[in-house]
């Protein structure tokens, strides 16, 4: 897998278009181990049809996190819209730990007022039994007035709040995915796309007749770096996802590949073969100043930044087979990081620096694995035959990767503890090279 040959000829097109739910999510494992929760339908205080089923979005978000098992609406003992309407006993009898309730009201000019509360069922049951006036069982309560066009995004915001209050970790539902869609037999078979993490609000940033590869998000979520072959060779570009403006970063002879943003957003770690074997370089995005990092005679590739911004992880064949190494940018000192498995490659670190995620080869099959950075314990997370391109959510809880599902290259999810698994099948073509965005405001 490490020795990829690149070919290209001509043609690309910049554009922006939207679509709905281009990616569906099919749960394949792990939901039975999740915590039971309920998201009651939000009360609609208006005329006509509810503009957005916020409760459904929140429920699906929490389910996809792998940490929660939302109660089906048909199993709910009641449909309260405020904490005061909750009868805690029947919820507790079903094992529900917390309930989300809320309401939506139209306020004119296409705007809506949304109220919601997150309620602890056990604390509420105890408070009612003691006959007290305390509302300490209300874990969170908020109100916002928003445009109708932002209602789905606000639902993700509610999910983030609920997730953080119940787990102590920041939610990653207000995030995006970047990926390459391949539709062979069309005028522009390669398309660089972004979408909300759940597949909604998809936009195409670039259409090309030739391969597009390795999208990588800037730390502020406003730009993508990627590899394009539109000019008969590999080149690295940076493109603003809002203005569509892009700039050419490198166009050297040979390989220009694998861009990865530094934590400060000023530099890219890249792979160049302009002087022979593929080696690691760092390029300043503004000045284009280039600094060589490794001088190996074998393949060094797939750089990834450590959270400190002073070290890189990378894949190298210097030991005979692909393994993960680290290199200090100041000293140039390298250290081998992986010793288990037939080979290991494509590593990245969770934001807290505690877990290294990578592709490991087990009995000839490529699977997603994690390695504890403290004790080096390796855990294989997937059981497929050809998994690749893992990208970690900004809160470190989930990994998105490319796999083969029902004969097509698709995207899949696995939690970093391995308990939750899902696939994001595509109805046509293939999906490759996923990249999870940073947290977005």
Swiss-Prot record:
InterPro entries: 6-blade_b-propeller_TolB-like, PD40, Tol-Pal_TolB, TolB_N. Keywords: Cell cycle, Cell division, Periplasm, Signal. Its main location: periplasm. Residues 1-21 form the signal peptide. Pfam families: PD40 (PF07676), TolB_N (PF04052). GO terms for cellular component: periplasmic space. GO terms for biological process: cell division; protein import. It comes from the Bacteria. It is found in: Periplasm. Belongs to the TolB family. Part of the Tol-Pal system, which plays a role in outer membrane invagination during cell division and is important for maintaining outer membrane integrity. The Tol-Pal system is composed of five core proteins: the inner membrane proteins TolA, TolQ and TolR, the periplasmic protein TolB and the outer membrane protein Pal. They form a network linking the inner and outer membranes and the peptidoglycan layer. HAMAP family: TolB (MF_00671). PANTHER family: PROTEIN TOLB, PROTEIN TOLB HOMOLOG. This is Tol-Pal system protein TolB. The gene is tolB.
């Amino acid at each position: 897998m490490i020795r990829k040959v690149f070919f290209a000829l001509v043609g690309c097109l910049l554009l922006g278009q939207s679509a709905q739910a281009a990616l569906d999510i099919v749960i394949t494992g792990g939901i039975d181990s999740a915590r039971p929760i309920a998201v009651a339908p939000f009360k609609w205080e208006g005329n006509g049809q509810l503009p957005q089923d916020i409760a459904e979005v929140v429920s699906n978000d929490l389910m996809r996190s792998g940490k929660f098992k939302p109660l089906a609406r048909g199993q709910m003992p009641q449909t309260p819209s405020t904490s005061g309407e909750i009868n805690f006993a029947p919820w507790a009898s079903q094992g529900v730990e917390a309930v989300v309730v809320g309401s939506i009201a139209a306020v004119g000019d296409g705007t809506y007022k949304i109220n919601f509360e997150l309620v602890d069922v056990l604390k509420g049951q105890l408070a009612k039994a003691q006959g007290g006036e305390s509302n300490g069982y209300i874990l969170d309560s908020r109100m916002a007035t928003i445009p109708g066009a932002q209602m789905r995004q606000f639902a993700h915001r509610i999910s983030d709040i609920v997730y953080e209050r119940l787990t102590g970790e920041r939610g990653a539902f207000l995030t995006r995915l970047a990926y390459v869609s391949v539709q062979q037999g069309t005028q522009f078979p390669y398309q660089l796309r972004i979408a909300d993490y759940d597949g909604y609000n998809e936009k195409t940033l670039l259409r090309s007749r030739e391969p597009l590869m390795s999208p990588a998000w800037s730390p502020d979520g406003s730009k993508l770096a990627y590899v394009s072959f539109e000019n008969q060779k590999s080149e690295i570009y940076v493109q603003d996802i809002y203005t569509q403006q892009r700039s050419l970063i490198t166009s050297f002879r040979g390989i220009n590949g694998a861009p990865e943003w530094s934590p400060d957003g000023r530099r890219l770690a890249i792979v160049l073969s302009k002087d022979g074997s593929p080696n690691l370089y760092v390029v300043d995005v503004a000045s284009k100043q280039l600094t060589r990092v490794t001088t190996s005679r074998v393949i060094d590739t797939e750089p990834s930044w450590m959270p400190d911004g002073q070290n890189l992880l990378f894949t190298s064949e210097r030991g005979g087979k692909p393994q993960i190494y680290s290199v200090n940018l100041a000293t140039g000192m390298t250290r081998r990081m992986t010793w288990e498995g037939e080979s290991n490659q494509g590593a990245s670190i969770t934001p807290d620096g505690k877990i290294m995620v990578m592709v490991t080869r087990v009995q000839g099959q490529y699977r997603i694995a994690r390695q504890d950075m403290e004790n080096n314990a390796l855990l294989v997370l997937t059981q497929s035959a050809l998994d690749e391109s893992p990208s970690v959510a900004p809160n470190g809880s989930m990994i998105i990767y490319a796999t083969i599902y029902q004969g097509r290259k698709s995207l899949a999810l696995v939690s970093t503890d391995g308990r939750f698994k899902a696939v994001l099948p595509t109805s046509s073509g293939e999906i490759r090279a996923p990249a999870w965005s940073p947290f977005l405001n």
